[in-house]
């Protein structure tokens, strides 16, 4: 099976390829010749995930090529960090919370500064995945509960990984191995849900 992942984020692409089983070949936007960014204008993770998947699906319908001829579908994800003490922020604004252009380090510092002096540091990561096959759209999601650390630690991962401590652990995502993170992360769980959906669609 061939699926196009509707994202220009190289970190996400690598994680998705590591998580999904080997019988699912994940193509990048570069692989199919799609150039440019997709404006994420939705008010929710569900809307933004759908916007990205639809944009690439519609583009493929207008740009037939040997690369797209064998593609079975398109999927996209949108991920949000939801911090309880901040009423669910940054949420849909997670990637660009500190402003344009998107900067992981600046986003992390904004989170730490916003929680200075606050003991309630509960948070969760949520990923919504949109799948389009034969024109039909379906969505699944995955999430992981945790808390925001007092300071950055760890050198792995990306984004908010150095400040997010998943439930049941005393280290941030950035301190875990990729295998450990992928087995419990929001994106890992969303990809597991995607696999279950794909299996259901085959039956």
Name the predicted role of every residue range:
Residues 2-4, 10-203:
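Anionic-ligand binding patches
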């Amino acid at each position: 099976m061939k699926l196009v992942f509707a994202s220009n984020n190289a970190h996400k692409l690598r994680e998705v390829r590591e998580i999904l089983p080997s019988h699912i070949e994940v193509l990048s936007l570069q692989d199919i010749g799609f150039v440019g960014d997709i404006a994420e204008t939705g008010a929710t993770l569900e809307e933004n995930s759908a916007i990205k998947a639809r944009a690439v699906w519609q583009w493929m319908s207008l740009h037939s090529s040997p690369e797209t001829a064998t593609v079975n579908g398109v999927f996209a994800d949108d991920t949000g960090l939801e911090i309880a003490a901040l009423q669910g922020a940054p949420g849909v604004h997670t990637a660009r919370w500190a402003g344009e252009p998107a900067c992981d380090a600046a986003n992390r510092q904004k989170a730490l500064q916003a929680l200075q002096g606050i003991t309630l540091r509960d948070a969760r990561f949520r990923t919504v995945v949109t799948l389009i096959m034969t024109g039909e759209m379906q969505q699944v999601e995955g999430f992981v509960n945790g808390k925001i650390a007092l300071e950055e630690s760890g050198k792995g991962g990306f984004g908010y990984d150095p400040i997010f401590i998943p439930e049941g652990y005393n280290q941030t995502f950035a301190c875990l191995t990729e295998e450990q993170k992928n087995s419990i992360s929001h994106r890992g769980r969303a990809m597991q849900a995607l696999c279950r959906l794909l299996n259901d669609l085959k039956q």
